[in-house]
Amino acid sequence: MRSYLLAALLSITLFSSFTTKKNEQQTLVYNSKIQTEINRDSIIEYAKKYLDVPYKYASSDPKKGFDCSGFVNYVFKYFDISLPRSSGAYKNIGKAKSPEEFKVGDILVFYGYKNRKSIGHVGIICEANGMKSKFIHASSGKIKSVTISALDSNHYSNRFYKCINVLPK
């Protein structure tokens, strides 16, 4: 009788150990799957949730509104990517890409509309097609909200400074 009880306890212990390890492996697979889902398209999908949020100077709060760098900073922060909070700070980060290299999720950097010596605007490419790409950004212009614009419009193509990749390789 004692040996049956010992065998039963041993069986339960072994069975529960295998079950725990199986669950741990499933959790690891699940977590690695989540990590692979953070890609360029998911960044744009997340950014588009904020379309029509009003423009608000010096803000990175979706409840109050965004300015351009606040919007870019907020979107990438969700994916644990730290970026400058000021559009001017983008002048010295990243290596400029040629239009053929533009990808969804890259950041477009623009001169100010009054001054071609300083950086005044940033946005995120949401449709990559070289200088005909489209980008999502917080616009202080007529629209005064998060919107999608064409890079090849006169307003933006004339102010274009560079395109950079900020995503890990």
Predicted regions and their residues:
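Intrinsically disordered, low-complexity
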Residues: 2-54, 158, 166-169
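Aromatic- and glycine-rich peptidoglycan recognition patches
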Residues: 19-35, 95-97, 120-169
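Catalytic cysteine-centered active-site loop
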Residues: 34, 53-104
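A generic structural signal for ordered secondary structure
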Residues: 42, 46-50, 74-78, 121
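Short glycine-rich, flexible loops that bind phosphorylated cofactors or substrates
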Residues: 116-117
